[in-house]
Each structure stands twice: as C-alpha cells, then as structure tokens.
Amino acid sequence: MTQCHTETMKILHTSDWHLGRTFHRSPLTREHQQFIDELLEYVHAEGIDTLLISGDVYDSTIPTAESTTLLDQALTRLMRAGVQVILSSGNHDSFRRLSYGAAFFEASGVHLRTSLEDATRPVELTDGTLRVHVYAIPYLAPRLHATALGVDPTHQAVLGAVTNAIRADAAERHARGEGADRIIVMSHATVSDTTGSDTAGSADTTPRSDSERDISVGGIDWVPASLFDGFDYVALGHIHKRYPVTHTIRYSGSPLGFSFSEEHNRNGAYLIELNPGEEPTISSHEWATRVHMKTLRGTMDQLLNSPENSPYEQGYYCRIELTDETLPVGAVDRLRSRYETISHLSLIHI
C-alpha cells in the first residue's frame, strides 16, 4: 500500500505524452522536455501525490533513444519528489517493452500496468484516513483478448468484461474488509456519453483529431460511458483534446498539440482532490508549453506583406493556404523568405 503525504490526496491525470513524436518530420524533443520541466514544477507547487499516465507515453512501439531518455529522466525526478506514478500502456505503446522491469519499478513507486491481468490488480493509495484503489486498464485489442474473456471481439464486449471484473474484485476486497473508500479507473479507449444508452452505434460525440490512430473494429471504435458506471473517477486516454465525457469521466488530452487539427486545443491535465467523506473535487490545469502552430490563409501578396502575420515569422510551424487562382511561381521559396518553418502548403479556392 502506498502512503500519501498530505491531508488532501492529490492525483494528477495526464495521458498521451507520445514521447518521440515528430511534427511534420520536425522532432518535438525540445517541447517534450519543456513539458516535463513544467510538469515537475507543477507537481512540486501543488504537492501532487500521484501522477496518472493513461496510455501512449511513447509514440511508437519501438521508442527512440531520445524518448526513452526523456521518460527515464521524468520518472527519476518524480520518484525523487516522492510522487507515485501509475502508467498504463496505450495502442501506440509496446506492452511488452513497457512492462520491462515492472517489479523493480513497483518497489520504487512506479506502477506499470500493461496486461489483461494487471487490470484487476489495483494500486492502493492511502493517507491514513482515506484508502483509494486505482485500477489501470491498458489498451486491450479485442482480437487479442476476447477469447480469454469469453466475449465477442469488440471494444464494448472486452471493456465491459474488464470493468465487470474490476467491480467483482472491488466487492471481494470489501467483503474481506480491505475495500476502498474511492475507486479510480484508468482506460485507454474512445468513450462517448450516449445519455444512458448501452448500445454501441447510438451516437458518438467524441471530438476527434487526425493525430489519433484508428482503433475501430467492424467500423466501431467507441464504447458508451455507461460501462464505467459506479466508479468515482475515470481517467481516460487516447483522445488528444482535454474534455469531460461526464463530470467524473474525463479525457486529460495530450500535453502538446501534434497536428494542425489540434491548433486550437488548450492542452492540460485534470487535478483530482480527495478528502474523507467528501465528493472528489476536479479542476483543470492548462500547460504553458506549446507546439506553436498557425494556419495562415491568403494570397501570396497578403501573406508576404500583412503586418498581422509578423508574430508567426519565427518559432511557429506554419500551414499556408494560398487563395491565388493558380500556384505562384517559386511559392515555397518566396514564403520561406518570411516564415521560418512552413510545414504544409496548399492551394485552395474559396
């Protein structure tokens, strides 16, 4: 059982770090390092007890040397700060690679959850007066896990079986006098509020981004929020926009924007504060670290001469949408004479 050090238990919900990600072939190592530095500053300032990372800590099943170094340094700094870390694997991660050294890390306060069996093995947190069980469900590909669970190979059937197993485990612990005051579930999935419907296909209201990998099975990639009924908080990963599905079922979103479709996202995290006898207090936090990107639209003359675009000349990834009748000769070179980084150029007609 993991001991927390403050009267109010503070848990920070993050996900989808995607270490090793590039932005239109430009490495994001610098921005990821800035995010980790900012995260540590916030952890110290707020007195965070536990950090959740709900899947896709890496961008690839074979992470780069730079990305493994970033994670190693982040976990080391968090351990030194006395912060417990609960990390589940996502659809971008290799669950086998991520589980390496799990027993060693567990003893150091880093709890890796990467397998089906891990989903019903909660991390126990306590501050002496409050006991919290965190069940971390890794990404479970239906075709790989449906047979073991005895269900159809769909996301809804697999996640439904696992959440029912979690409820059964929680009930057994309660019967033994080892039950929790609060139950938190982590999951890496597409979850939509269907206003009580438990039939997949009714309505999917999830905001999407083109930087998220498709996980659909039979054309359906989402599950209803009702699968998570009865839990005190559900920390979701996979969707890159920070938003609540319901009051207690939330996506933290990614810490950085990874495509122009996320240009207007306000990336951040959720802080969950727990006190005995009280409902969880949930607040949002916005990261200052940014992947600076901007879509600029206009004629060649407007783009080269408009003073309004001066802030985007340096330090920004620019998506240029030219509205000229035809593509001007030497368009890229002319635009690069003003804008440092042009990540995408297209000719559009409006």
Annotate each language-model stretch with its function.
Residues I348-I350:
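Conserved small/polar residues in nucleotide/adenosyl-binding loops
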Residues Y100-S216, P255, N275:
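Conserved catalytic scaffold of divalent metal-dependent phosphoesterases
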